[in-house]
Amino acid sequence: MSGGFSADLAMFIPLLPMLTFPIILIVGQLFKGEEWWIKLKEGGLISLAAMGSVLIISLLLVYDYIGGLHGEHASDNVIDKVGDWITFDFLSNSSEPMISKAFGLGIYVDHITLMLLFVASFLCFLINWFSIGYMNTDPINENRNHRFYAAFLLFCSGMLGMTLADNFLWLFMFWEVMGLCSYLLIGFYWERPSAASAAKKAFLTTRVGDVFLMVGLVILWNIYGSLDFATIFDWNYIANPVDTGLLHIGLLMMFIGAVGKSAQFPLHVWLPDAMEGPTPVSALIHAATMVNAGLYLVARMFPIFAAGDLSGELTELAILITWIGGITAFMAAAIAFVQMDIKKVLAYSTMSQLAYIFTGLGVALWFANADFEGHMALAYFALGASLFHLFNHAMAKGMLFMASGSVIHEMHHAHHHLHHHDDHDDDHHEDHFDAQDMSNMGGLASKMP
């Protein structure tokens, strides 16, 4: 175990929201409508306290790793094994006797982990704060906000757990937690047929990618006999002769899983419909967390591509990743031009920017797998640029979605104020007015701060 005090606390980063999730769900169901529960914003303040604690622990971990604890050894990884989950015997490929293997629940911290951990914890906290004002002021959400905050916390737990996982099995399990919660959050207004349909569409489309991801992990296990990052990313271990054709297939399967999660062509169809969820859900799924999971998975492949004995063996896959990113970036940006729904414009913009990052990661992987002087310097530069844009985009798009939520919120109130005096026409206007239609938003700059 290494990493000091903050590493010991790191297990609470995914654990706190996971433990708070059933508390809010059960208490909210038992005491909904009670005055004291309403004062707690139907669980919103409890959720905010949990995410605030997570943010503080995350900042401590970042500080210890980069500046305080490690100092000049800030590039060291922190591997903290909390415990073994499954232990079983199996026959190895060699003539060795039965070998015991375990999937331990632990944390793995490097620069990629820290970057995404800060983005996820910081934006989840801000979106939670925004949700208290957004969700609790709308009468349609009365007495059911506890379900929103419970699913929100479980989603955050899944994202944070995936970011800190020290092996691909736990990464996959937390990955699936996010998939379940996205279904619950997108379909929060389940009484609307469009929302229920969008939730099912998102769930089934991303499951297609997840099946490929699971196959890829099985192939990876078959090659390395382990799913631990510390083993797979060990260049001395990777340098041992491996079946490059099988490895190529395994990494391709994993990339398809990332394509589904990050809404890239051709598994992009779920993202625009996911706007049926409340605006905080749009900010959470499409900016801060879920869509970045696919990018994180591809970035995690970097050490495999950089292994010396695999030089030139994986360039075709790197080129494919670059092409998929380029095609999706152009396609999504073109579609965004003809959208009138403010949230769909942001959704297609998100898809395009994520594709831009995929293109950068593909270039980084190509350089890492190349074999010429200075190729690793170019690979690290491309990787850093891609992750820097991921950071920028997550922050900017999270704020844009929350700003669009404020605009939509005020459009609803303005429309109601203009037409409440005419009871006869009110229903007619409500049936045809779309608060998300940008053609109704002319002159807002002079009316809103």
What are these regions (language model features)?
Residues 1-449:
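...captures the hydrophobic TM-helix bundle architecture rather than a specific catalytic motif
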